[in-house]
C-alpha cells in the first residue's frame, strides 16, 4: 500500500506511527510506503554526534532511532518511509539499502536526471557538480527491528537548502546538498513521490517474488 500522510507532517508523530506499525505487524502484514513532506526539522540518527549540529537556530532537533548522522527535512522534499518485511523479501540490510538507492536512481532517470550516482562508502544519491564535487540529493536512513524495516529516504525536490548550512550533512563537513530544481529538473513533490514509491514497490515486490520462488524450489 502506498499512502500520502497529511502535510506538513510532524516528524515525531510519524516516527511514533512507524514504530507502532512495526511493533504490531506480523508475518502476514502487508508492506506499506508512506509519503510525506515534513515541517522543518533536523533529525539525528543513532550514530549522530552533537558536533555536527553547527547552528540549528530555531529549527527543532529530534534524536531518532534510524541509522546515520544528522540531516534536515523540510517543505519541498519528499520522504518515502518504507515499512518492509525484509525476511519475506530475503534481503539483508546492505542489500536493502542497495535496493533503496537503485530505486532512487531509477526515479531520477525517469525525471531526466541521468547523471545522478552513488558514492562508495557514503550511502545516498549524489549529483556531480562542475569541478567534480559530488552534491547530495537524496539521504537514506533505516532501522530494522525483528526483520521489519522502517524509516527510509528523503529526496530533495525544490526546497530552501539553506538549513543544510546549519549542520554537517550526514556527518560530512562541507558536504554540499542540491535539489532537482537546482539541477534543472522541474517537477512537483507529488509527482516525484509517486514515481519514487512506484519504483520502491516494484523493486521490493520483485525481491518478495524471487524469495517465494526460491522457497518453493521454482527456478528463477
Curated annotation (Swiss-Prot):
What is noted besides the main data?
Answer: In the reaction, the free carboxyl group of octanoic acid is attached via an amide linkage to the epsilon-amino group of a specific lysine residue of lipoyl domains of lipoate-dependent enzymes.
Origin species, per record, is Bordetella bronchiseptica (strain ATCC BAA-588 / NCTC 13252 / RB50)
Q: Which CDD domains match?
A: LipB
Does the keyword Acyltransferase belong to this entry? yes
Quote one Gene Ontology molecular function term: lipoyl(octanoyl) transferase activity
Domain of life of the source: Bacteria
Chief localisation class: cytoplasm
Q: Name a single GO cellular component.
A: cytoplasm
Q: Can you give the residue ranges of the BPL/LPL catalytic domain?
A: 27-208
- Keywords for the protein's UniProt record, in alphabetical order: Acyltransferase, Cytoplasm, Transferase
Question: What role does this protein play?
Answer: Catalyzes the transfer of endogenously produced octanoic acid from octanoyl-acyl-carrier-protein onto the lipoyl domains of lipoate-dependent enzymes. Lipoyl-ACP can also act as a substrate although octanoyl-ACP is likely to be the physiological substrate.
**Record-marked site positions (Lowers pKa of active site Cys):** 136
Q: Where is the active site?
A: 170 (acyl-thioester intermediate)
The name of this protein is Octanoyltransferase
Q: Where in the cell is it found?
A: Cytoplasm
Residues spanning the membrane:
none
Q: What is its EC number?
A: 2.3.1.181
Which pathway is recorded for this entry?
Protein modification; protein lipoylation via endogenous pathway; protein N(6)-(lipoyl)lysine from octanoyl-[acyl-carrier-protein]: step 1/2
A Pfam family reported for this protein in Swiss-Prot or TrEMBL: LplA-B_cat
Q: Where does substrate bind?
A: 66-73, 139-141, 152-154
Gene Ontology BP term (one): protein modification process
Which chemical reaction does it catalyze? Answer: octanoyl-[ACP] + L-lysyl-[protein] = N(6)-octanoyl-L-lysyl-[protein] + holo-[ACP] + H(+)
What NCBIfam families does the record point to? lipB, PRK14342.1
User: Which InterPro entries does this entry report, sorted A to Z?
Assistant: aa-tRNA-synth_II/BPL/LPL (IPR045864), BPL_LPL_catalytic (IPR004143), Octanoyltransferase (IPR000544), Octanoyltransferase_CS (IPR020605)
What family does the entry list?
Belongs to the LipB family.
Amino acid at each position: 500500500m502506498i499512502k500520502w500522510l497529511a502535510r506538513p507532517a510532524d516528524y515525531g508523530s510519524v516516527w511514533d506511527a512507524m514504530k507502532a506499525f512495526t511493533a504490531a505487524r506480523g508475518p502476514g502484514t502487508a508492506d506499506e510506503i508512506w509519503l510525506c513532506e515534513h515541517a522543518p526539522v533536523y533529525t539525528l540518527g543513532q550514530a549522530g554526534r552533537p558536533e555536527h549540529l553547527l547552528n540549528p537556530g530555531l529549527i527543532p532537533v529530534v534524536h531518532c532511532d534510524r541509522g546515520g548522522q544528522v540531516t534536515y527535512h523540510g517543505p519541498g522534499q519528499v520522504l518515502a518511509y518504507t515499512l518492509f518485511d525484509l525476511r519475506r523479501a530475503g534481503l539483508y540490510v546492505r542489500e536493502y539499502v542497495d535496493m533503496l538507492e537503485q530505486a532512487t536512481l531509477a526515479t531520477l532517470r525517469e525525471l531526466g536526471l541521468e547523471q545522478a550516482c552513488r558514492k562508495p562508502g557514503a550511502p545516498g544519491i549524489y549529483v556531480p557538480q562542475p569541478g567534480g564535487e559530488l552534491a547530495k540529493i537524496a539521504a537514506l536512513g533505516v532501522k530494522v527491528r525483528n526483520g521489519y524495516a522502517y524509516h527510509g529516504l528523503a529526496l530533495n525536490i525544490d526546497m530552501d537548502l539553506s538549513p543544510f548550512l546549519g549542520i554537517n550533512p550526514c556527518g560530512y563537513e562541507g558536504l554540499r546538498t542540491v535539489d532537482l530544481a537546482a539541477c534543472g529538473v522541474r517537477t512537483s513533490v507529488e509527482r516525484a513521490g509517486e514515481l519514487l514509491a512506484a519504483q520502491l514497490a516494484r523493486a521490493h515486490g520483485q525481491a518478495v517474488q524471487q524469495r517465494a520462488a526460491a522457497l518453493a524450489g521454482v527456478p528463477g
